[in-house]
């Protein structure tokens, strides 16, 4: 399967990838976080709420070490499944969008920076938070 914006992941340079669902999410993240010329961080899209073995292999083959799952806030179960699939290969964090109804392209620059500065969660922290929210 394809990864949108995969060409922005540079061999042995890009160590962190932000995983989003769709093209517009990647465009919003790239624009608002100014990732155009950042060789260490790239945003890519899986075209949905799942990641395939081929997509995982593609990220591994480029030397990516850290993956931040940035799926939409309403994709709780998909985030958990994706995190479990990625954990054996990468250091995994989840970008916790507080408002489940919003996508990356609906968030302001300040909101996005706030998520990446203060609300990146480990897989365990994310799972515990979601249990507490029930």
Model features per residue range: what roles?
Residues 17-19:
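Conserved beta-strand elements of the Class I
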Residues 1-14:
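Glycine-/acidic-rich phosphate or pyrophosphate-binding loops and their flanking alpha/beta elements
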């Amino acid at each position: 399967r394809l990864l949108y914006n995969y060409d922005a992941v540079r061999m042995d340079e890009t160590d962190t990838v932000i995983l989003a669902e769709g093209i517009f999410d990647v465009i919003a993240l790239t624009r608002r976080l100014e990732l155009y010329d950042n060789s260490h961080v790239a945003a890519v899209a899986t075209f949905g709420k799942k990641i395939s073995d081929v997509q995982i292999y593609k990220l591994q083959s480029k030397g990516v070490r850290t993956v931040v799952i940035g799926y939409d806030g309403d994709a709780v179960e998909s985030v958990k499944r994706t995190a479990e699939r990625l954990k054996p290969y990468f250091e995994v964090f989840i970008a916790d969008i507080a408002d489940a109804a919003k996508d990356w392209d609906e968030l302001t620059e300040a909101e996005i920076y706030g998520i990446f500065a203060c609300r990146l969660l480990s897989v365990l922290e994310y799972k515990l938070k979601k249990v507490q929210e029930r």
